[in-house]
UniProtKB/Swiss-Prot annotation:
Residues 89-127 are annotated as: Disordered. The keyword Nucleotide-binding applies. Residues 113-124 have a biased composition (Low complexity). It comes from Rhodopseudomonas palustris (strain BisB5). Residues 1-73 are annotated as: Domain I, interacts with DnaA modulators. The keyword Cytoplasm applies. This is Chromosomal replication initiator protein DnaA.
Amino acid sequence: MSNMEHDRWSRVKGRLRSSVGEDVYSSWFARMDLEAVQQESVHLSVPTRFLKSWIQTHYSEKVLTCWQAEMPEVCRIDLTVRSPMRAAVTKEAPAPAEHRRDEHRPAADARSHAAAPAPSNHDALGGSPLDPRLTFASFVVGRSNTLAHAAAKQVAEGRRGDPVMFNPLYIHSGVGLGKTHLLQAVTWAGNSGTERKVLYLTAEKFMYGFVASLKTQTSLAFKEALRGIDVLVIDDLQFLQGKTTQAEFCHTLNALIDAGRQVVVAADRPPADLESLDERVRSRLAGGLVVEMAPLGEELRLGILKSRVVAARTHHASFDVPQSVLEYLARAITHNGRDLEGAINRLLAHSKLNAQPVTLEMAEHEVRDLIRPQEPKRIKIEDIQRVVARQYNVSRSDLLSSRRTANVVRPRQVAMYLAKTLTLRSLPEIGRRFGGRDHTTVLHAVRKIEGLVSKDVTLSDEVESLKRQLQE
């Protein structure tokens, strides 16, 4: 790049920074490079496909305008994903100096230097505690968690330098369905060798570490240590709070993914439903592999119970639970895996303390408070949009579009009404999920349908039919 092109590129970046603001610039444009300038086009590059897609979708006109202020003849911006190898070569350029220093050391000293372990940044960060029981060996696989288990296993078995297949890996489910088990299994497996540095943090631990680094003026060391991790595992992301902390998490996420490092995240809902998180973070998370762990089926619950009995026998060899009792527990305790484990612990305690064998009568008495009423099905806005679109013979994209024809407006209003009555989503969130509409539009739709169903029998029947379909 010539000096003239370098100066011009610096001015364009300055215009872009002023136009979009420092936060947006840092998140999306800080890693954009100038590759070439031709007569009517400019060739730019970014390190990931996600950045390319996001910039092209949201900022292509703005980038072009900033260039045209410098070069009016430019009519096209070409944005490509640069090779990871190029970035690696650039970052490793200072290495020869280190090699030259080693060449002048005595042989014994050089061998000592080569054998020394790498600085343990992940130890210095103080990861969250790990439960030694939560490994892949103790994880019970069933229909509801097969994909999540396979993806987590793929991450855990990766080696430094391998291409990353899906990044970030985002696992979500309700409480007690195995998210933390999988994340800790990834960490145990990843740290079993010395090749990779794998760090497991809860969102609260991440927040605590970042805030503490600000107070002690060690935030730079905190950031550098985090970004030296090969695999970063973050649990309970729904608890990540604070604008500054979220911005730092977003920067860390971008830095690790752009460097080809793996990120694994778990939360209790999909990325789009994390309303407290900045949109940039939600978008970045949604750009990887998003996997839902569904509620445990009866067959899987039975498998979990059997595995817990086997685990209990390692310390209590005579402990036994009849098959009929296990089948009863699998049918009766449907809430989550923690309740299943709690049931086995209660039976073990009662059996040992009272020197009595486990019976069905004992089990019914001991676990009675773990048998909860069946919870209503959790309905998603995407499900509502899909069912409504099918009912009214329109497409889901029609519901999200700006079309105002009668055959689209009424289904859209019905879908918004159902989203408000069947989910816990706020009006602004519902509006955002319907093509970025304002909350007042949603409120108008809800009131409109509420008024009509009390007078229009046909519409009332349609709405009730849709509710039944969604709740089945």
